[in-house]
C-alpha cells in the first residue's frame, strides 16, 4: 500500500500523467538515474511537492523569445500537456488511503476536505499511466504495472495447501476446516452480497459496507 501511495503522489488523479516534466532540471536528473529503484524514489521526491497538473502553453506564456547563442531560431519549449486539475495530498490511515483537498470558500479561510480513495479509484488512475511515464518512474511495463498491485482476481490455493484439521488429533474424530478456508468463505459470501445488492439496485453505500 505504501508503493501505491507513492505512485498516487507522482501522477495526476485525473489524467494519470506524471506531475513533473523535462522542463524541471531535478526531474531530468531523476529520470536519468540508472537504478530503477533509486529513479522511482527520486521522481517521487520531485513530484510529491506539486499540487497542480500543469496545462499552460509555455511557448505563448513567455512574451520574450529566448534565443540560443549562434542560433536564429528560438528555443522550443516543451509543454507538460496536463489537464490543469488541482492535486490532493495523499494520506494513509491504517490500510486506507485518503485524498486531502484545500477548498477555497467565498468568505473565510480555506478549509481542508478529506475524501477516501477507494480501490476502484486507485486502480483506474494506475491503469491509465502511459508506458513512457512508467519507464520514467523506474517501473517495468511488462512485469511491474502499478495496477497489478491492487488485487482484482483472488487466487485460491488448492485444498492440499489448506487441509482440514482433526480436532482430537487422532485423525478419526471431528474435523475442522483450516483458517484460510474460513476466510475464503467469508470473502465469497461478501462478494455474493455485493452482487445481489447491485442486481437489486441498492444504494452505493450499502454495497460499499460489504
What is the role of each PLM region?
Residues 1-210:
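Conserved core architecture of multi-subunit DNA-directed RNA polymerases
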Amino acid at each position: 500500500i505504501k508503493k501505491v501511495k507513492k505512485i498516487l503522489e507522482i501522477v495526476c488523479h485525473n489524467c494519470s500523467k506524471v506531475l513533473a516534466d523535462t522542463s524541471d532540471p531535478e526531474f531530468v536528473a531523476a529520470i536519468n538515474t540508472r537504478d530503477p529503484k533509486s529513479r522511482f524514489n527520486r521522481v517521487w521526491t520531485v513530484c510529491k511537492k506539486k499540487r497542480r497538473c500543469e496545462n499552460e502553453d509555455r511557448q505563448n506564456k513567455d512574451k520574450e523569445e529566448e534565443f540560443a547563442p549562434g542560433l536564429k531560431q528560438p528555443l522550443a519549449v516543451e509543454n507538460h500537456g496536463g489537464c490543469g486539475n488541482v492535486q490532493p495530498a495523499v494520506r494513509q490511515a491504517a490500510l486506507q488511503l485518503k485524498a486531502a483537498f484545500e477548498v477555497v470558500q467565498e468568505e473565510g479561510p480555506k478549509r481542508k476536505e478529506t475524501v477516501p480513495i477507494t480501490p476502484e479509484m486507485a486502480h483506474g488512475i494506475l491503469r491509465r499511466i502511459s508506458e513512457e511515464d512508467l519507464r520514467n518512474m523506474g517501473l517495468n511495463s511488462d512485469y511491474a504495472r502499478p495496477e497489478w498491485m491492487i488485487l482484482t482476481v483472488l487466487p485460491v490455493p488448492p485444498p492440499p495447501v489448506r487441509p482440514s484439521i482433526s480436532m482430537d488429533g487422532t485423525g478419526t474424530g471431528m474435523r475442522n476446516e483450516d483458517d484460510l478456508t474460513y476466510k475464503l468463505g467469508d470473502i465469497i459470501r461478501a462478494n455474493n452480497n455485493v452482487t445481489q445488492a447491485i442486481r437489486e439496485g441498492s444504494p452505493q453505500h450499502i454495497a460499499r459496507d460489504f
